[in-house]
């Protein structure tokens, strides 16, 4: 008679559901912050290490994946970058428009009394776009060190096309390097429960949420608008693309991408997570290896919402009337600003003065609005990143599935 041994604890942890493990890490992090504040602050190192590891591996992952996919691209094989790019831009503009409607329906006001410190926002939209264009011609080593994904994409695409003319041994080497980096990414992601345990513990211990209660209405409008975009606007765009129930895909992306992004608060750190999810969904590698890092740079629905809501809150506070054409123009400006947010230190918050300038709001008052943004940043930045990053993989999957459906229907007709 033989007895079958039950799998050990380590084996269960290594092969169990990552989402369930993350939930356990989340609960344990909250409990530790509640029981012992010093201990919770100490384990914050685990979260810092996890986010640092993701940020470290993401640039080289993007470089190798894009190089490998372009170098090994077969002639005549179609990618779906243009449809995805269109979805990115449409999604960002739709988010800004939804934020305008939400802000009119639930107007918020601010207490403009704090200072934003020595922060230098860009002087205009031209400067934002100039920074975005200049990042394309960055030194490749500098781009890798600083996580400049526009620069990394440009070099990876250029080297990929150049390597198309190389011999098969070189192409195989690039492909093997890409697979090796992908393996390292999977290894890092397995430590997500420990990392999120550290992040949650330290965040609750060091900041708490007591300071957020003074801005409860503003946060409700911000987070409510982001939920509206995630659960209504994005599903409508996905349904328009794939013509079937979008919610299984939407909820999967929120669960397996948005949860990570919420706690890491970094679109760059979430690139490896999104790449792994695309592989799990069996999407075209040539497509997602380009669209995911591109989305982390320009697909900024959450940033568009933040810029729009905080700007209109300042407008309401000062009693400035806003007509429909001006509101539509604000949506366009917020969308353009959001697309350039990755190239600005401080991200979406420091682009608020550009939008405020539309209404003749002085820079001093605009920087006080930015200061409010930093106060609520614990929750605002987490929700914004979760929406931005989960939308990257959502729109990539929608475009790839739509193309697969088109090819299948074409084959049936023939």
Swiss-Prot record:
Annotated TM spans: 16-36, 46-66, 84-104, 143-163, 180-200, 218-238, 300-320, 332-352
Membrane topology: Multi-pass membrane protein
Ligase among keywords: no
Reaction it catalyzes: L-serine(in) + Na(+)(in) = L-serine(out) + Na(+)(out); L-threonine(in) + Na(+)(in) = L-threonine(out) + Na(+)(out)
Alphabetically ordered keywords of this record: Amino-acid transport, Cell inner membrane, Cell membrane, Membrane, Symport, Transmembrane, Transmembrane helix, Transport
Disulfide-linked positions: none
Pfam family name, one: SDF
Gene3D superfamilies assigned to the protein according to its UniProt record, in alphabetical order: Sodium:dicarboxylate symporter (1.10.3860.10)
Side Cytoplasmic, residues: 2-15, 67-83, 164-179, 239-299, 353-414
GO CC list: plasma membrane
Gene Ontology process terms (BP): serine transport; threonine transport
Protein name: Serine/threonine transporter SstT
């Amino acid at each position: 008679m033989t007895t079958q041994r039950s799998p050990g604890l380590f084996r269960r942890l290594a092969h169990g559901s990552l989402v369930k493990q993350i939930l356990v890490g989340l609960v344990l992090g909250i409990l530790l912050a509640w029981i012992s504040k010093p201990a919770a602050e100490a384990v914050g190192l685990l979260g810092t290490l996890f986010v640092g590891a993701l940020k470290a591996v993401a640039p080289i992952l993007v470089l190798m994946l894009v190089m490998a996919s372009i170098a090994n691209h077969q002639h005549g094989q179609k990618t779906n970058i243009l449809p995805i790019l269109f979805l990115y831009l449409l999604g960002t503009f739709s988010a800004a428009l939804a934020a305008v409607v939400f802000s009119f329906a639930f107007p918020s006001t601010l207490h403009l009394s704090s200072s934003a410190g020595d922060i230098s926002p860009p002087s205009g939209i031209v400067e934002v776009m100039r920074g975005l264009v200049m990042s394309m011609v960055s030194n490749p080593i500098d781009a890798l060190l600083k996580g400049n994904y526009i620069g990394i994409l440009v070099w990876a695409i250029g080297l990929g096309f150049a390597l198309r003319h190389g011999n098969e041994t070189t192409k195989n080497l690039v492909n093997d390097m890409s697979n090796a980096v992908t393996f390292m990414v999977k290894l890092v992601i397995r430590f997500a429960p420990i990392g999120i345990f550290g992040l949650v513990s330290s965040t609750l211990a060091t900041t708490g949420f007591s300071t957020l209660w003074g801005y409860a209405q503003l946060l409700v409008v911000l987070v409510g608008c982001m939920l509206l975009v995630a659960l209504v606007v994005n599903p409508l765009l996905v349904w328009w693309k794939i013509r079937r129930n979008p919610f299984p895909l939407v909820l999967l992306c929120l669960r397996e991408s948005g949860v990570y992004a919420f706690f890491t608060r970094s679109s760059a750190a979430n690139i490896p997570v999104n790449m792994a999810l695309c592989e799990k969904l069996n999407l075209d590698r040539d497509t997602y290896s380009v669209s995911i890092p591109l989305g982390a740079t320009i697909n900024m629905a959450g940033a568009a919402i933040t810029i729009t809501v905080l700007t209109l809150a300042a407008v309401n506070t000062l009693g400035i009337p806003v007509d429909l054409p001006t509101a539509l123009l604000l949506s366009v400006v917020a969308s353009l600003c959001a697309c350039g947010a990755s190239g600005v230190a401080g991200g979406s918050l420091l682009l608020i003065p550009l939008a405020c300038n539309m209404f003749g709001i002085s820079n001093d008052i605009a920087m006080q609005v930015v200061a409010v943004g930093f106060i609520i940043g614990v929750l605002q930045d987490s929700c914004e990143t979760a929406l931005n990053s989960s939308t990257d993989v959502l729109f990539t999957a929608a475009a790839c599935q739509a193309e697969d459906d088109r090819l299948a229907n074409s084959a049936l007709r023939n």
